[in-house]
Amino acid sequence: MAVYVKFEISQELEEKTAEVVANAEKIKKGANEVTKAVEKGIAKLVVIAQDVQPEEIVAHIPVICDEKGIAYSYSSTKEALGKAAGLEVPTSAIAVVAEGSADELKDLVEKLNGLKA
């Protein structure tokens, strides 16, 4: 497990996260864009790939999410995360800026916050 992975998520929760990302109206992709979205406080949910090398690229993201009170989750691979976001290329991180279904997102955030407690 990578150093920046603070908790493990089930396959079911990973699939639910991918669904929320796929249904999102607007996303930011890549570690730099995600960092900016979190720092500005516009991110509703952040998803980080677990296979990023070197790990330092995304290691700061869970820390700033905790500081800003933004929920975050993990994807098993960069490829899976890119595919969920509708991209043809892998991506290290995604920030959902405008959700597709607010209820879906709220339910997922509650489950993720329960894992961190």
Curated annotation (Swiss-Prot):
Temperature dependency: Optimum temperature is 36-38 degrees Celsius in the absence of L7Ae, 48-50 degrees Celsius in presence of L7Ae.
Chief location category: cytoplasm
Subunit structure, interactors included: Part of the 50S ribosomal subunit. Part of the RNase P complex.
EC nos: 3.1.26.5
Catalysed reaction, written as an equation: Endonucleolytic cleavage of RNA, removing 5'-extranucleotides from tRNA precursor
Entry's Gene Ontology cellular component terms: cytoplasm; ribonuclease P complex; ribosome
Gene name, Swiss-Prot/TrEMBL: rpl7ae
Enzyme class: hydrolase
Locations listed in the record: Cytoplasm
Gene3D superfamilies: 3.30.1330.30
Entry function: Multifunctional RNA-binding protein that recognizes the K-turn motif in ribosomal RNA, the RNA component of RNase P, box H/ACA, box C/D and box C'/D' sRNAs. Part of ribonuclease P, a protein complex that generates mature tRNA molecules by cleaving their 5'-ends, this subunit dramatically stimulates RNase P activity.
Keyword GTP-binding: no
Family of this protein: Belongs to the eukaryotic ribosomal protein eL8 family.
Keywords: Cytoplasm, Endonuclease, Hydrolase, Nuclease, Ribonucleoprotein, Ribosomal protein, RNA-binding, rRNA-binding, tRNA processing
UniProt protein name: Large ribosomal subunit protein eL8
Protein's UniProt keywords contain Iron: no
GO BP, sorted A to Z: translation; tRNA 5'-leader removal
Sample GO molecular function, one term: rRNA binding
HAMAP family in the record: Ribosomal_eL8 (MF_00326)
Pfam families (UniProt xref): Ribosomal_L7Ae
